[in-house]
Regions:
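Conserved extracellular-gate-facing transmembrane-helix segments in secondary transporters
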Residues: 28-39, 43-45, 139
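Central cavity-lining transmembrane alpha-helices of secondary-active solute carriers
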Residues: 37, 60-79, 95, 127, ...
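Short amphipathic helix-loop junctions that connect adjacent transmembrane helices
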Residues: 38-58
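Intracellular juxtamembrane helix-capping segments at the cytosolic ends
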Residues: 138-152
Length: 163
């Protein structure tokens, strides 16, 4: 009888099914961030021939914006669009940003006049990076709120849903 009651409420292993979707989404976003963080410098310095200082500047800007944008994304969600729409919009921006990262253009070449880079590819790269940053800004602060809303007020399982 307990298993039919659990299934009727849309639970899986004692928690709402939506928790696992939120968990998978958060896992994907964190994998994206840490993977990008470690590969970005190599990509910029080896493929586009940025100096170490310039590559670290882009990496530092990316990392700081990823941590700063959730303040703005949470504010916009709270005041204007709501948390579910913010999570969806953030996820779509993240997908678009990662799809844009698939376009790499031509590798930079060292010439006697300096470094010759594919400026169109770099423009797409920066746009894609911006889409990822804004996507994280909408997704990150609001997905935790969605997890909290999956449980009724006072539900003993609520704390376990965040761990």
């Amino acid at each position: 009888m307990t298993s039919t009651t659990t299934a009727a409420h849309g639970n899986l292993w004692g928690h709402p099914k939506g928790l696992y979707i939120c968990f998978g989404t958060e896992l994907w976003e964190r994998f994206s961030f840490y993977g990008m963080k470690y590969l970005l410098l190599l990509y910029l310095t080896k493929y586009h021939l940025f100096s170490d200082a310039a590559g670290l500047g882009v990496l530092g800007s990316y990392a700081s914006l990823v941590y700063a944008m959730p303040v703005l994304g949470g504010l916009i969600a709270d005041r204007f669009i709501g948390m579910r729409k913010a999570v969806t919009f953030g996820g779509l921006l993240l997908v678009a940003g990662h799809l844009g990262m698939a376009f790499e253009g031509e590798a930079a070449r060292q010439t006697s006049d300096g470094v010759l880079r594919d400026e169109q590819a770099l423009s797409i790269f920066y746009l894609s990076l911006a889409l990822i940053v804004v996507g994280v800004g909408f997704l990150k602060p609001n997905i935790s709120t969605v997890v909290g809303k999956l449980y009724p007020e006072g539900d003993a399982r609520r704390d376990a849903g965040f761990t």
